[in-house]
Amino acid sequence: MFKKFAIHFVIIVPMALLSLVLTGCNASTPTAESPTVAVPTAASQPAEQAAVMPRPGGPGGASTFASVAPTYTDLAYADQSAAQKLDLYIPTTGSGPFPVVIMVHGGGFMFGDKADGAGLTGVDQLLEAGYAVASINYRLSDEATYPAQIFDSKAAVRFLRANAAEYNLNPERFGAWGASAGGNLVALLGTTCGVAELEGAELGNADQSSCVQAVVDWFGPIDFLAMDEQFAGTSCPATHDAADSPESKLVGAPIQTVPELVATTNPMNYITADDAPFLIQNGTADCNIPPVQNQNLAEALSAVIGADNVTYSSLEGAGHGGSEFETAENLQMVIDFLNKYLQ
């Protein structure tokens, strides 16, 4: 059902703000040292994060999602659920066809909405840089269990590609940007191109590709079964294994009881050499998702698709979203990455 890779490529991860680890690496022999990682604690996590952002994701992550209204609201990309809608923002300058960034909100797979991003920001900056933006909703775990969420995400990509001419979009230049739960989904978009069992072709436009050409993963959960062990020995709560955790609710059972299904939520199990380039970011003080989750994803991708196609940065002192991700400098880093592959 899925492919596994033994990861031997190891990257030293300095914790300076926005340190670029994988971009520009040369082909020298990898070091045998382990990645340097700052261990997050509940005390180091911003108080407001613990108060308003349940694992993994939640409302309030981004102060401003967009200052402009969508050009098109509630476009239905499938017809099985009222949740299967997207908002589309089109730049007001430029002639197009425009490259597209699909934004996938966070919220622990339990809540969040396309109108607020739930952990995302940057619509204004994307529009100014000449990108169309499609912010999607998907079925949440109280309505449908996994793989409905990745089915919906892929259906949205196929819908946009099928209707690219109508909306003046470039069907060959699609990126995906997600935060927290959305980070997991965009990482799957970037690694499961052509994986039939995760396609959900019955949702429509089956003749279209659901592949994306660039991925921005903000602090997404990657390996559900490893999270509590990775938090062991820290003051961060280790509750992902609980029967009522967001991850267990996503798959419809305690995660330890359905390891084969849980394995299909892990992007690292699908990495191949033709995967999309990735920008991966997390905070060093994230007490919701262990920072090593995204470090491991970056290393696994780098070993297979090449270090030049993977950029990893760790934001010193940042938690699970928040203002550190929203700075002009960091948003420009995202735009620069997307420009490299989509413009």
Which positions does each model-derived feature cover?
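N-terminal cap/lid segment of alpha/beta-hydrolase-fold proteins
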Residues: 53-96
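Mobile cap/lid helix-loop segments that gate and shape the active-site cleft of serine hydrolases
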Residues: 61-67, 191, 195, 226-270
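Short beta-strand element of the alpha/beta-hydrolase
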Residues: 97-108
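Short amphipathic alpha-helix adjacent to the substrate-entry channel of hydrolases
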Residues: 115-134
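Alpha/beta-hydrolase active-site loop
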Residues: 144-165, 332
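Primarily recognizes the serine-hydrolase "nucleophile elbow" in alpha/beta-hydrolase
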Residues: 155-232
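Short beta-strand/loop motif that positions the catalytic acidic residue
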Residues: 274, 279-282, 286
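Conserved alpha/beta-hydrolase "acid-adjacent" motif
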Residues: 287-296
